[in-house]
Amino acid sequence: MTDRSFLDWPFFEPAHRELALSLDAWATENLCDIDDSDVDAACRELVRRLAAGGWLDYCVPAAFGGAREKLDVRSLCLIREILARHSGLADFAFAMQGLGSGPITLKGSDAIRRDYLPAVRRGQKIAAFALSEPEAGSDVAALAATARRDGKD
């Protein structure tokens, strides 16, 4: 990483600076030999490597083996920025683990959290966030569907 001046921005803590430098060094060593001719296989391999490197620990809270007590947006942004500089596919693989685990962390039942979050962190399950609606596609902010309770269930 040639320009590190952004790490001096006031909203980054020393731990964020250490994270950025450590990930950049790791990515230089671990992302240079990914064969992306088979994108699905490459993504699975990237998730495996990200888990082995401890980077997926940032996708889940500490209660499920994660790096921090709560998900930290600054850490997630730094990780994505650095991974994207090294490999767009590595950024994609990391982003999907985070996008899929975020809603489970925030609103999942205890049983779902116990089942999925540790496995996502270890790279044993590939997380996803999927939705679609006519006129909105995958734009969450444009969703128009509503729900209303009908009965006691």
Task: Please report, for each region that a protein language model flagged, where it lies by residue.
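Residue-level recognition of alpha-helical structural elements
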Residues: F12, V39-C43, I112-R113
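Short loop/turn motifs at secondary-structure junctions and domain boundaries
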Residues: T2-D3, V39, A136-D139
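Glycine-rich, Trp-frequent "lid" loop and neighboring beta-strands that shape
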Residues: G66-E69, A111-D153
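Hydrophobic alpha-helical scaffolding
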Residues: E13, D36-S37, E69, L106
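Extended amphipathic alpha-helical segments enriched in small hydrophobics
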Residues: L19-L23
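Short secondary-structure junction/hinge motifs that connect adjacent elements
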Residues: T28-G54, F64-R68
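Intrinsic disorder at enzyme termini
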Residues: M1-E18
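Internal helix-loop-helix
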Residues: A52-Q124
